[in-house]
Design a protein with these regions (language model features):
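Catalytic phosphate/metal-binding cores of nucleic-acid and nucleotide-processing enzymes, i.e., regions
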Residues: 1-100
Length: 100
């Protein structure tokens, strides 16, 4: 059965939110984050917001490095929000990578 890319992306965003929130809690940061559900209704919004950062998450089946369009997308979101762009991306059977 084919995988719905929107569902796969949302699941990956939830995984990243969980990892970030566990990190914040473990390291006594007074922060929490959640998925930005407004991203589906409003253009140029990031997937996840934490103070001063716009986070875009990408999970694809194949590849080994970020696509320039992904970086442009997160930079556009960050500029609109006045924050620092962060791209978190993963391909199947490849570790997660982060570009800042």
């Amino acid at each position: 059965m084919p995988i719905n890319s929107r569902t796969k992306g949302a699941s990956y965003e939830r995984d990243i939110v969980k990892i970030l929130n566990e990190f914040f809690l473990k390291n006594n940061f007074n922060l929490t984050c959640k998925r930005n559900l407004d991203q589906y209704q409003t253009k140029n919004l990031s997937d996840i917001n934490i103070p001063f950062h716009a986070i875009e998450c990408k999970h694809y089946k194949e590849g080994n490095w970020l696509k320039p369009d992904w970086w442009k997308q997160v930079c556009t979101s960050a500029e609109a929000e006045g924050t620092i762009p962060v791209l978190i991306f993963k391909f199947n059977r490849v570790p997660t990578r982060v570009a800042i």
